[in-house]
């Protein structure tokens, strides 16, 4: 899982009057403090069995592959449960994919569309992205996996065809705005 939140004590830096800045800060804080974006991944994705900290995959690619596995999960998950618990297993899998996996992707799309106009207006914004991995592997491996998941989120933003997030992530925007993603694996 990857959690994206507003960094509470950070400020948005800009050249607009202070009143406008406070309104923008409040709107973004409400959005990300109250509704953080939670992204879910299939086990050991992206780049399974890799010690790399970066990936070339973007989150949409990993999401699409994960959602295609929903039927497999519905078949396999019940077999791991006691017989009396199997009846609701398919419903639980469907519920997880609808209320967590798909919702996370929908929240990401909403977030990307909402955030971009603030950057276009010259606001610099700092986000915190924290990666999580199951405790099945060694801790140092999970840290690298979490970093790859954060990398897939950044790649998603940079590859959006209708927005140029790259200039804000690489600090090359003509208006001086930046999108800073602090990683907390």
Give, region by region, the residue ranges found by the protein language model:
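Periplasmic peptidoglycan-binding/anchoring modules of Gram-negative envelope and division proteins
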Residues: 22-23, 27, 47-130, 154-165
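Extracytoplasmic
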Residues: 34-38, 122-124, 178
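Structural recognition of the beta-strand scaffold that forms the well-ordered cores
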Residues: 40, 126-131, 182
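Pro/Ala/Gly-rich low-complexity, hydrophilic intrinsically disordered segments
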Residues: 1-50, 56-67
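Generic structural motif
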Residues: 4, 125, 179-183
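Periplasmic OmpA-like peptidoglycan-binding domain that tethers envelope proteins to the cell wall
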Residues: 101-103, 132-185
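A broad, low-specificity signal for short, low-complexity segments enriched in glycine/proline
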Residues: 2-3, 87-91, 174
């Amino acid at each position: 899982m990857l959690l994206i939140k507003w960094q509470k004590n950070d400020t948005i830096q800009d050249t607009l009057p202070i009143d406008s800045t406070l309104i923008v800060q409040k709107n973004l804080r409400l959005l990300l403090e109250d509704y953080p974006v939670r992204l879910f991944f299939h086990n050991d994705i992206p780049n399974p069995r890799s010690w790399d900290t970066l990936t070339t995959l973007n989150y949409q690619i990993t999401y699409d592959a994960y959602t295609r596995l929903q039927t497999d999960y519905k078949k396999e998950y019940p077999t791991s449960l006691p017989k009396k618990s199997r009846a609701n297993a398919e419903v639980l899998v469907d519920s997880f994919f609808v209320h967590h996996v798909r919702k996370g992707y929908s929240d990401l799309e909403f977030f990307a569309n909402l955030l971009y106009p603030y950057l276009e207006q010259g606001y610099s914004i700092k986000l915190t992205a924290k990666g999580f991995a199951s405790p099945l592997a060694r801790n140092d491996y999970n840290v690298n996996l979490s970093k790859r998941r954060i990398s897939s989120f950044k790649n998603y933003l940079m590859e959006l065809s209708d927005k140029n997030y790259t200039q804000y992530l690489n600090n090359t925007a003509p208006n001086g705005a930046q999108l800073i993603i602090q990683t907390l694996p």
